[in-house]
UniProtKB/Swiss-Prot annotation:
Domain of life: Bacteria
Organism: Anaeromyxobacter sp. (strain Fw109-5)
Pfam families the UniProt entry points to: Ribosomal_L1 (PF00687)
Function according to Swiss-Prot or TrEMBL: Binds directly to 23S rRNA. The L1 stalk is quite mobile in the ribosome, and is involved in E site tRNA release. Protein L1 is also a translational repressor protein, it controls the translation of the L11 operon by binding to its mRNA.
Protein name per its UniProtKB record: Large ribosomal subunit protein uL1
Length: 234
């Protein structure tokens, strides 16, 4: 543990806790603060001026990252007939209907994402207690329930990420790996922020994006210069 603490302290020493960093500098710095032997995920914590207790201020959405997430995603699809075939041809790892639902009810969870065609939601809905707590329940608002199931599969395989504001008004979303080049991290992050700004609720008052902090899985937080973000996306 002392060795781990020493590494974290060394990484933290590279970050000025008071400074708000420009994007280019932040993306280079986030790579420097990754100290683990595994390829750490890079996350953004985006503090929004919304009150999620009000339904009209719940910010959620999804975006296909231009450079993906740097990992293979195992996808389960609930579909029948031609739609099942389309899902398989698009690269889905597991495709089924009632048979797949029975497996999931029995404890089968060997997948990262769950997609469904609209006609299958009656079956999938019964899995709410299993899929819901794991954040796997398909939802049309983020494109995981879709009639164009082939496109939905391809987007997930390409690195689609979903986000939803939490109780404290914060959105946590991953946007790459520490091994990515800074330019790729920047492009992925910018794609997320574009959607975040577009998702601003009409009822939100005051400052919308209040704070943004980047970090690797085990690294220190790096605060961003909000004026640069507002100029690019606001």
């Amino acid at each position: 543990m002392a060795h781990v603490a020493k590494k974290f302290k060394a990484a933290s020493a590279k970050v000025d806790r008071v400074k708000r960093y420009k994007l280019d500098e932040a993306m280079s710095l986030v790579k420097q603060t990754a100290t683990k032997k595994f390829d750490e995920t890079v996350d953004a914590a985006i503090n929004l001026g919304v009150d999620p207790k009000h339904a009209d201020q719940v910010v959620r959405g999804a975006v296909v990252l231009p450079h993906g997430m740097g990992k293979a995603v195992k996808i389960a699809v609930f579909a029948k007939g031609d739609k099942a075939r389309e899902a398989q041809e698009a690269g889905a790892d597991i495709v089924g209907a009632e048979d797949l639902a029975e497996k999931v009810q029995g404890g089968f969870m060997d997948f990262d994402k769950v997609l469904a065609t609209p006609d299958m939601m009656g079956v999938v809905g019964r899995l709410g207690k299993v899929l819901g707590p794991r954040g796997l329940m398909p939802n049309p608002k983020v494109g995981t329930v879709s009639a164009d199931i082939a496109r939905a599969v391809k987007e997930q395989k390409a690195g689609k990420v979903e986000f939803r504001v939490e109780k404290a008004g914060i959105v946590h979303v991953p946007f790459g790996k520490a091994s990515f080049e800074p330019e790729k991290l920047k492009a992925n992050f910018s794609a997320i922020m574009e959607i975040i700004y577009k998702a601003k609720p009409q009822t939100a008052k005051g400052v919308y994006v209040k704070n943004v902090t980047l970090s690797t899985t085990m690294g220190p937080g790096i605060k961003l210069d909000l004026s640069e973000l507002a100029a690019a996306h606001g």
